[in-house]
Amino acid sequence: AASDVYKRQDMVHIGAVLRVTPIKDVKTMIRAFAYAKRDVPNLKLWIMGPTDEDEEYARECFDLVDLMELPDVVFTGRVNVTEYLGGLDFTILTSISEGQPLTILEGYAAKLPAIATDVGNCRGLLYGEDDDFGESGILTHIMNVKEIADAMVNLARHPVRRKQMGENGYRRVMAKYK
């Protein structure tokens, strides 16, 4: 349940809102999370969204979590994402292809910074296209486990920077998309 997000206040909660499909590259996200957890043991990853679109891929993701012994990766299935956003510290998107990712905008509306791969309009959302609000997240290359892990560690270890990026994202989404 959404209330579970709040049970461990000492945790840093990462949210991924997506369909569990190959184009979202959930396996890279899981591997990066495993590396990041070595440096920041109090991380928790919430993967929110349907798992029935590509059941074989979803099963491979579940198996990877089991194999890597990652009890702090939670697949919620379909949920009301807004119930979770307030308990998260930042969002993550590791897609290999994307258009205008709504999940980043939803996170910004909740003042959450984002880690995202450099696909679609992610660069514009994180760095601004025609505004001077500042960075609202960390951009990474696709399928780059180390870079994505480093971004997770960076945001997890720097709550002040995280808060500032979240504020920047909030201003960006309010100015451009409200």
Label each region the model flagged:
Residues K7-K24, I30-F33, W46:
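Conserved donor-binding/catalytic core segment of Leloir-type glycosyltransferases
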Residues N154, R161-A175:
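A short, well-ordered alpha-helix in the C-terminal region of glycosyltransferases
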Residues Y127-V145, N154-P159:
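Conserved acidic donor-binding segment of nucleotide-sugar-dependent glycosyltransferases
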Residues A1-Y6:
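Short, small-residue-biased leader/transition segments that mark boundaries at the very start
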Residues P113-A116, R123-L126:
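Short hydrophobic beta-strand element within catalytic cores of glycosyltransferases
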Residues A58-R78:
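Nucleotide-activated donor-binding/catalytic signature segment of Leloir-type glycosyltransferases, i.e.
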Residues I96:
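Aromatic "clamp/platform" in nucleotide-sugar-dependent glycosyltransferases that forms part
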Residues V17, K44-R59:
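Glycosyltransferase donor-sugar binding loop
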